[in-house]
Design a protein with these regions (language model features):
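Acidic, histidine-bearing metal-coordination/catalytic regions of metal-dependent phosphoesterases
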Residues: 80-184, 191, 195-204, 325, ...
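Surface-exposed, short loops/turns at beta-strand junctions within beta-sandwich domains
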Residues: 47-49, 137-145, 544-549
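Short, composition-biased motifs enriched in small/polar/acidic residues
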Residues: 484-559
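An acidic-aromatic loop/edge-strand motif
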Residues: 16, 25-80
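Aromatic-lined ligand-binding clefts that engage carbohydrates, nucleic acids, or primary amines
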Residues: 1-7, 55
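Active-site neighborhood of phospho(di)ester-bond hydrolases with catalytic His/Asp-centered motifs
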Residues: 178-181, 208-214, 241-248, 297, ...
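Extended active-site neighborhood of metal-dependent phosphoesterases/phosphodiesterases
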Residues: 145-169, 222-325, 340-353, 379-428, ...
Length: 559
């Protein structure tokens, strides 16, 4: 059977997918108990029109030799209202947040909230009858956990211990950021990436959650968003604000300003979460702790330096005083994955028009997707040409950025500092991988592997981790700010039972001694606690009764 309401298909059972006609057979025979089995479906009331509605059914035999045919149906109304999407959170700031949800029929909107699950003492209410509910909570306390419920007067449609959010902190704190690029496949690949992060971050809450575009394949329809985002992350959406950007696939199901993305999400247009007002959902900025986030639209907005988007971005960056600046958009300025930044207009224009502005205002990290791979650059500045134009001078640090190898990337400035280098990451493998040459000269590492990006910001330290879908860490690096010189071992001495290490240091910077009993040096553990430097050279020593000749020592920068 196939059911239609007002000419729109609403249900299909035991019929093949795709177009059918009077000659299409049912998939299997129905016999015995199956002949009296009823199926219950829930009808979306938004499909009902005022006045007369038409419910039609077409019933198909399983073969041309069948001689009996029966069908029965009933339609009944219920007073039960159900949430069909969400709730989900938008516009999180120190003092406010937006709670959204969708109901299967029009109701008033009510959010109750408070500091404990048993005392939701505050509320916001809107008497308009709507199915798309969007309620702004204000006058909240920074860095505070609130529980909430959603519904309408007299009815709670959703509440419980996992209905909560934490407002952004007023002061600096350790911040965990999770970024997903091109994740919207709604398949096992996306699920494995999701689950790997859940295991990796178990016990460590996510503070900022980013999606880098192509969030719902293949056309960014409302139904595809339901499967790839809302059904994929229902728990996380209830207590984490989701910050998104527009990918090319977001635009395939609508015209310039009417694709579903713009109706599903409510990013800050009027500086509700910091930064300057953009006046549009397509690009915006926000602050969290000591990080300023800049979201640009690389798909539908004017990418020229004098266009509305970059005029706003320059003013926004000029007003930014945060310690860190992270920009994100969909089309990467450098890639040789499933897309090529030497060939595609959006990628070329973001590199040639946008990067000079961002680097002039001291951007630290740029995240994008589009290429279904993972690529991570060196610490770069001033590279705005094609891949064959790469010169050594554009690499401010040609090392790995790993403390245990060539050392972290260092930037002497505190806060936005022009042309001290940025790292560019393509993290477009959160839902699929598509290969490519993976040989762009700007990149230190290029991987055709599924995964997501985890960032941990702690004061003047930013640590990045590429986490595979199988839980393995396949890349990591660190950026340190306020550092004018690299850590150099100035003396290392083993004499009898004494180990002595001295190194160049900067007053106020924290170090640790780590040791390894592995001759390959691939398993390290902290041997000391924090050692805070008070001068330009710091030393440490210890005595050992029986020193292992294969033991290794190293000095690492903590922050």
């Amino acid at each position: 059977v196939i059911l239609y309401l007002n000419g729109v298909e609403i249900y299909r059972n035991n019929m093949p997918a795709g177009l059918v006609d009077s000659h299409t057979f049912a998939v299997t025979n129905v016999f015995g108990a199956g002949e009296s089995t009823f199926y219950s479906i829930k009808l979306d009331t938004s499909l009902l029109a005022p006045g007369i509605n038409f419910l039609a059914a077409e019933v198909h035999q399983a073969g041309s030799d069948s001689i009996d045919l029966s069908f029965d149906a009933s339609l009944s109304a219920s007073n039960v209202v159900l949430i069909t999407r969400g709730p989900y959170l938008q516009q999180g700031s120190e003092t406010g947040i937006v709670v959204r949800w969708r109901s299967d029929r029009g109701t008033e909107s009510l959010v109750k909230y408070g500091a404990s699950l048993d005392n939701l003492a505050f509320s916001v209410h809107d008497s308009a009858l709507v199915t798309e509910h969007e309620m702004a909570l204000s006058n909240l306390l920074p860095g505070t956990k609130y529980y909430y419920s959603v519904g309408f007067p007299g009815f709670d449609l959703g509440s419980g211990p996992d209905y909560y959010f934490v407002t952004a902190p007023a002061t600096n704190k350790t911040t965990r950021i999770w970024a997903l690029g091109d994740c919207g496949t709604a398949n096992g690949d996306e699920q494995r990436v999701r689950d790997a992060y859940a295991n990796f971050s178990s016990g460590r809450p996510t503070d900022v959650w980013l999606m880098l575009g192509d969030n719902a394949y293949s056309s960014g329809t409302d139904l595809e968003y339901q499967g790839a985002v809302f059904n994929m992350f229902p728990d996380m959406l209830r207590h984490n604000v989701l910050w998104t950007t527009i990918g090319n696939h977001e635009t395939y199901s609508g015209i310039f300003d009417e694709f579903p993305y713009l109706h599903i999400f409510s990013p800050p247009r009027n500086a509700e979460a910091g930064g300057l007002p953009s006046g549009t959902k397509k690009y915006y900025s926000f602050n969290y702790a000591n990080v300023h986030f800049l979201c640009l639209d690389s798909m539908t907005s004017d990418r020229s330096p004098s266009g509305a988007m970059m005029t706003w971005a320059q003013a926004d960056l000029a007003a930014n005083t945060n310690l860190w600046t992270i920009a994100f958009w969909h089309h990467p300025p450098y890639t040789k994955g499933s897309h090529d930044s030497d060939l595609e207009q959006e990628l070329i224009e973001m590199r040639t028009n946008v990067l000079p502005i961002l680097e002039n205002y001291g951007v630290d990290l740029v995240l994008s997707g589009h290429s279904h791979c993972y690529e991570r650059s060196y610490l770069l500045d001033g590279f705005y040409g094609y891949s064959w134009d790469m010169k050594p001078a554009y690499k401010l640090d040609a090392g790995s950025g790993r403390p245990e190898e060539s050392g972290p990337y260092i930037k002497s400035g505190i806060g936005p500092s022009a042309h001290q280098g940025a790292v560019y990451i393509v993290a477009g493998s959160s839902g699929q991988i598509s290969g490519g040459q993976l040989n762009h000269p700007a990149m230190f590492v290029s991987l055709n592997e599924l995964g997501s990006l985890v960032l941990d910001v702690n004061g003047t330290s930013l640590q990045a981790t590429f986490l595979r879908d199988n839980g393995l860490v396949r890349d990591h690096f660190t950026i340190l700010k306020g550092i004018t010189q690299r850590l150099r071992i100035s003396e290392f001495n083993i004499e009898d039972e004494l180990v002595f290490i001295a190194w160049t240091s900067k007053p106020g910077v924290t170090y640790r001694i780590q040791s390894s009993s592995s001759t390959t040096g691939n398993v390290w553990s902290d041997y000391t606690g924090n050692i805070t430097a008070t001068g330009n050279e710091t030393s440490w020593y210890d005595f050992f009764d029986d020193l292992d000749p294969d033991r290794l020592f190293r000095v690492v920068v903590i922050q």
